[in-house]
Amino acid sequence: MNRLSITAGACMAVAAAPFAIAEVLVTGPSSSATPYVVGVPGTPVRCVTSILTVGDAIGGYQMLGIPDGMGAFMVGEQVKLFIDHEFQATAASGKRAHQSGSTSSGGAFLSGWTISPSTFEVINGFDAMTSVATVTNGTGGALDKFARFCSGDVPEVKALFNATTGLGTDHRFFICGEESGTPGRMIATDLDTGVAYQMTAFDASSGAWENGVARPMDSNTTVMIGTSDGGANRVFVYVGTKQASGNPAERAGLLNGTAYGIQVKVGGVDVSAEDRVNALGTASTGPIYSGTFTLAAGGTAAGTTFLRPEDGAWDPTNPADFYFVNTDRMSTTSAGANQTHGSRLYRLRFNDVNNVLAGGTIEALLDGTDVMEMGDNLCVYNTLGGGTRVLLQEDPGNHPHSAKTLAYDVQTDSLQVILQSDPARFGAVGMAATAPFSQDEENSGVYDARDTFGLGWFVGNMQSHYALAAPLIEGGQLYAFYSPTLLGSCDSDVAQPIDGSVDGSDIAQLLLDYGTVTGFSPSDIDGSGEVDSGDLSLILLDWGYCSG
């Protein structure tokens, strides 16, 4: 497929952006380092701010390495943000809260952070998982020792609670899985109580779990999709039933369901495995990028094998659509030799949201011939006009390719690179990394932060794979970035919250900000460092509705 590759007050300190004149790079009040990601030429991103860097300590609680899956919500006027850390079970990450009273120590865990939404100041940190209700040992050999938590998700309340019937629970959960061993364990942590439950229905699927994502829909049925990067290399659909009684995980329908494999069919014939060159087709048929799917029972033997299915997400306003990306491998070796690869973005569209067992259709929206390399993490969000977009993050591994963040517009079928790993640290093709950093880095964890930091804000993290002393293990950083264009608006939409139009409220905001900018201001539209007549001219040029 040929495609066109095309919070306001929180950025309180400014550094010159290396590429795009309008981009501001900010060291947040709690971070010891400038942002690990920067814009590319022509980026729609206005501001990037670092929130926490590995090694930073808040009230004695330290940010440890290999941050991966994330989610957040508001508690009062503060943001509660949660991160899972992708440590091996043997990692000396210290004795965690959920290991209190046992002989276990270290491994993967879940950290929580309280953050000011207006300044990005981190107020405190804590272990979010405080006890376990697991029933089998993982690769760490203990009930309370976890290995390689990867992508994660904090589902919307309606995913686990039906307000109409009262079934389910309004407790917030963090769901993630072990991307290690067969089977890895799928873990749902009750963020209200700190109890981590094992979703045993996923055990028979023998997954190395990248993520488990619950559908955001009012229903008595709990639907969740698990992606297995390794092990079965398949995509599984969990179907459970919400209850009126039991512990919070039981009420949520997380412990009584069944997992089914996605079985892709083309022309009514089962597709056993995705192909690097031909996708859902074969050498005899040539490339095929769409088909149908059914749900197959039978544990690890059920369904189509994909090329390392990674992260996935539901369309927030369309519970029939689920998007997932597969990683596969790079289009070149580390030495630069060309090789076939098939990193793709797929959409599953269920025929009946009230009966997911009825199957649906599958389509490769990005078919492996695009600029995306080893797509790993993603988020799906809706624009101000109701369109659907996908942010995709790359994990090129130990390769000179700089890990990128890309934005895909489903309606226009356009793909744009917006961020890259800082080449001054991590290097790039033809450019060596700067010690202690290396070319082995991964962008991860991205989510739409409109409900916490405001419309136009997104949060991501960086895994920087160079060794640090225990308990840090490896480097990394938590960061946020701001772009009204990604929400379908434009830079002249400066009044907060952005609304997709340029009108008197934006002029009023610009006049309030008029003069020299002492920090990032959305009103400094042209990035000159001063809110002046040039910015006013841009607002007048964009007067009316603006579309990003």
Regions found by a protein language model. Name each.
Residues M1-I6, G226, G240, G515:
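Intrinsically disordered/low-complexity terminal segments and short unstructured peptides
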Residues N2-I21:
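Gram-negative bacterial Sec-dependent N-terminal signal peptides
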Residues I6, A204, G299, A433, ...:
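Generic hydrophobic alpha-helical membrane-segment signal
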Residues I6-M12, A57, N354, A424, ...:
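A generic structural micro-environment signature
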Residues A22-L487:
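Sequence/structural signature of beta-propeller domains
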Residues L487-G548:
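Cellulosome-associated attachment modules in secreted, modular CAZymes
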